[in-house]
């Protein structure tokens, strides 16, 4: 039997929880270290499985990587390898973010098409199109993205969708291109802003971080730096949603609440009392949550990564909720597992209609990705009896000390091998 969690329902979560660095940021920052010869130091790194996996990818490219507590030191060689290890890259999606730095620094790259979460198609078309506009030839050969450029030049790039990954890869190539690159319809996520901050610290010239238009003036070389990862807004919001679901009282620190304004507004709509500070927020839920309507959108919209938790909240809310998924088409696979727990839910295309019931019922369930796994554990907290959650390695990829943090808040959760 694979490692799984036993989740006993009924506990009201109370207490304080501190979040560490953002998963969606740290992996791109690690890749960015390839852009400069020498040693870059990244602090506030989360203790998640994807960090050592990314370290293996970087080592395969010739870098030296040291992991010590929440600190990662990456020494990039004078001539990095350009062929990313197939076995390492295939394990998780974010590994494709080495594509931009390799094209920028080496003028060529060979990166296996990535693996990761089963939440639907996430093609690399926009990544390739942007790199082509910068002067690279990009093809798919034998399961790999192959890119090569004699020279990189600035370009006026219009993204069809504000893709975080495409924005970041194009950005990391453009910082070492000749001339000015403008990325229109760029992703505005805090993780992209964090990457821009580190790149500027390395000597890049970037304007417009946090807006939909990024202007990059290429430079001849970057230098190493030290950078602190922003707090993980998805992990922080997960704890806030858990407080609302269990009628709890949870204070979350280590995150900028400005990164979560719409989520905190939705928690207020659900009946929670939400107070904010410079370093976090507090969620107190006294009564049964109210139904909410949520539509996932790129930042500053409601994050698609929190859609499973929103469905979990809707499942035990008073009334009928409408959850609309506008980013990843296969994310509603999670609903089938929620129905095992007794949720009254149905899906129709991009929409899920959830009629709240007072309590879910325990059952064995399987997580298909990081956020679905976390959502199922939260659902288990409001189910009667003991819920078994399987394939929890997904959760370990994105949530540091998940079981330990839940236990510190009063949840009865056990990891079983």
Curated annotation (Swiss-Prot):
Pfam families: EPSP_synthase. It comes from the Bacteria. It is found in: Cytoplasm. UDP-N-acetyl-alpha-D-glucosamine binds at residues 93, 305, 327. Keywords: Cell cycle, Cell division, Cell shape, Cell wall biogenesis/degradation, Cytoplasm, Peptidoglycan synthesis, Transferase. Pathway: Cell wall biogenesis; peptidoglycan biosynthesis. The active site is at residue 117. GO terms for biological process: cell division; cell wall organization; peptidoglycan biosynthetic process; regulation of cell shape; UDP-N-acetylgalactosamine biosynthetic process. Phosphoenolpyruvate binds at residues 23-24. It catalyses: phosphoenolpyruvate + UDP-N-acetyl-alpha-D-glucosamine = UDP-N-acetyl-3-O-(1-carboxyvinyl)-alpha-D-glucosamine + phosphate. GO terms for molecular function: UDP-N-acetylglucosamine 1-carboxyvinyltransferase activity. It is an enzyme of class 2 (transferase). Coiled coil: none annotated. HAMAP family: MurA. Cell wall formation. Adds enolpyruvyl to UDP-N-acetylglucosamine. Belongs to the EPSP synthase family. MurA subfamily. This is UDP-N-acetylglucosamine 1-carboxyvinyltransferase. It comes from Mycobacteroides abscessus (strain ATCC 19977 / DSM 44196 / CCUG 20993 / CIP 104536 / JCM 13569 / NCTC 13031 / TMC 1543 / L948) (Mycobacterium abscessus). The lineage of its organism: Bacteria, Bacillati, Actinomycetota, Actinomycetes, Mycobacteriales.
């Amino acid at each position: 039997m694979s490692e799984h969690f036993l989740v006993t329902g009924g506990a009201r979560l109370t207490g304080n929880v501190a979040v560490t660095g953002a998963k969606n940021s740290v992996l791109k920052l690690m890749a960015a270290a390839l852009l400069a010869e020498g040693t870059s130091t990244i602090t506030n790194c989360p203790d998640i499985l994807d960090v050592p996996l990314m370290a293996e990818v970087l080592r395969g490219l010739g870098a030296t990587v040291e992991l010590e507590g929440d600190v990662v030191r990456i020494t990039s060689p004078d001539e990095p390898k350009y062929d990313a290890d197939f076995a390492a890259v295939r394990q998780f999606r974010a590994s494709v973010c080495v594509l931009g730095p390799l094209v920028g620094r080496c003028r060529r790259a060979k990166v296996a098409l990535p693996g990761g979460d089963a939440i639907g198609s996430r093609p690399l078309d926009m990544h390739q199109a942007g790199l082509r506009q910068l002067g690279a030839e990009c093809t798919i050969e034998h399961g790999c993205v192959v890119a090569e450029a004699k020279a990189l030049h600035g370009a006026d790039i219009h993204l069809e969708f504000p893709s975080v990954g495409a924005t970041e890869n194009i950005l990391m190539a453009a910082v070492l291109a000749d001339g000015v690159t403008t990325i229109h319809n760029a992703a505005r996520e805090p993780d992209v802003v964090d990457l821009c901050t580190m790149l500027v610290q390395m000597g890049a010239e970037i304007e417009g971080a946090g807006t939909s238009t990024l202007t990059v003036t290429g430079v001849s070389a970057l230098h190493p730096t030290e950078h602190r990862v922003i707090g993980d807004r998805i992990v922080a919001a997960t704890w806030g949603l858990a407080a609302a679901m269990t009628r709890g009282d949870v204070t979350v620190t280590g995150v900028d609440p400005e990164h979560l304004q719409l989520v905190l507004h939705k928690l207020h709509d659900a009946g929670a009392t939400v107070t904010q500070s410079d370093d976090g927020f507090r969620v107190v839920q006294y009564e049964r949550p109210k139904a909410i309507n949520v539509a996932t959108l790129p930042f500053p919209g409601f994050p698609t990564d929190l859609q499973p938790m929103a469905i979990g909240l809707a499942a035990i809310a008073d009334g009928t909720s409408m959850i609309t998924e506008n980013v990843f088409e296969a994310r509603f696979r999670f609903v089938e597992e929620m129905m095992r727990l007794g949720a009254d839910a149905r899906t129709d295309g991009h929409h899920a209609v959830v009629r709240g019931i007072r309590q879910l019922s325990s059952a064995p369930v399987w997580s298909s990705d990081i956020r679905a796994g976390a959502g199922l554990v939260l659902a288990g907290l409001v189910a009667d009896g003991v819920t078994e959650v399987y394939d929890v390695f997904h959760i370990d990829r994105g949530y540091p000390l998940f079981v330990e943090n839940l236990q510190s808040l009063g949840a009865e959760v056990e990891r079983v091998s």
